[in-house]
């Protein structure tokens, strides 16, 4: 009988392929459950199989997000400085929104709206 891989084992095999094949690996990290699981799997893999190797982490900061999400993202990125190369991006890009009947999009971190920003830009962002 052929043994089926469980999800964790399959993930470890796939991470090996990724880290063997690519010199630079980046994870897009929102602070949500899916990207959190992937980021932590990558960190654990590197600590176990490739100590000293770096992992790029890209976080697009939307300005108006839950405070707990922002705190979790900051805590997670700060807790692995030996592994993570963090790219914390705070740029005024066009984001669709469903919270207004008059506008179909908004721009976080727009300089022209600085007076009404939900919070100040983090000092470590691009």
What are these regions (language model features)?
Residues 1-126:
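ATP-dependent adenylation/nucleotidyltransferase module used to activate substrates
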């Amino acid at each position: 009988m052929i043994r089926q891989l469980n999800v964790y084992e399959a993930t470890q095999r796939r991470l090996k392929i990724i880290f063997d094949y690519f010199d630079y690996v980046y994870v897009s990290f929102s602070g949500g459950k899916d990207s959190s699981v992937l980021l932590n799997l990558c960190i654990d893999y590197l600590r176990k199989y490739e100590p000293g190797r770096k992992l790029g982490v890209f976080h697009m900061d939307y300005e108006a997000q839950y405070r707990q999400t922002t705190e979790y993202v900051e805590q997670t990125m700060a807790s692995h400085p030996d592994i993570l190369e963090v790219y914390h991006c705070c740029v005024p890009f066009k984001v669709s929104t469903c919270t207004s009947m008059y506008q179909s999009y908004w721009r976080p971190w727009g300089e022209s709206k600085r007076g009404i920003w939900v919070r100040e830009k983090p000092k470590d962002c691009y």
